[in-house]
Amino acid sequence: MKDIEDLIQKAVELQSNGLAMGQIADELNVSRETVTWLLTRSKKEEITPAPKDISVNWNNIGKSAKRLHNISLALCDVALENLEKIGAEVDVVVGVAANGIPLASMMAYELGADLAIYHRKGQETVRAGKGTISRNFGSVAGKNCVIVDDVITTGSTSREVIEQLREMGAKPRVVVVLVDKKGVDTIFNVPIQSLLKVVRLD
């Protein structure tokens, strides 16, 4: 997306394809507040101030298996560094649907760990419901878990995953992401490690 008009057009297109607000936010890597602003701005000429947000477009990584693999290796290194500090091993890599899955798949392979997939629920509101761990992949009960996502915007997804894993008897040890837009070090005492931290200066 080169500018704000591209973001508005993409948000309108995604909405017309039936995506919910939360799904549009995930697809564009922006907050729900920003999606609301983009869609509202597309419908009227009234100019309201833009929310303080940053759009992250990583499709040059996502469209290349080689680049995804290289980024996954870097995320593995970050995760292992953190696990060494606490003397823990990784048993399961948990990919957050949808954008965390390709990274988590490659990481699980590289780390010799099981793969689990977390599907969010409640895309329309932040806490509409709990997500689920897919039964078609690895079990998390009693296991050390590395959580993988693409971008942290508000931290709500990471909070949801950590809570759900703990309720299932798992031990979330670290969250690794490409980009942290929130700028947090921990969520529920679980370290957040990113390849990039984005800080907006106003």
Curated annotation (Swiss-Prot):
Residues annotated as transmembrane: none
Sorted alphabetically, the Gene Ontology BP terms of this entry are:
pyrimidine nucleobase biosynthetic process; regulation of gene expression; UMP biosynthetic process
Q: Which lineage ranks, top first, belong to the organism behind this chain?
A: Archaea, Methanobacteriati, Methanobacteriota, Stenosarchaea group, Methanomicrobia
Source species, please?
A: Methanosarcina barkeri (strain Fusaro / DSM 804)
Q: Does the keyword Disulfide bond apply?
A: no
Report the InterPro entries cross-referenced here.
GfcR-like (IPR022854), PRibTrfase_dom (IPR000836), PRTase-like (IPR029057)
Please give the superkingdom of this protein's source.
Archaea
Family recorded in the similarity comment? Belongs to the purine/pyrimidine phosphoribosyltransferase family. GfcR subfamily.
One example of the protein's molecular function in GO is: orotate phosphoribosyltransferase activity
The name under which this protein is listed is Transcriptional regulator GfcR 2
The entry's free-text remark on domains says:
Contains an N-terminal DNA-binding winged helix-turn-helix domain and a C-terminal regulatory domain (or effector binding domain) resembling phosphoribosyltransferase (PRT) domain.
What is the primary gene name for this protein? gfcR2
Keywords assigned: DNA-binding, Transcription, Transcription regulation
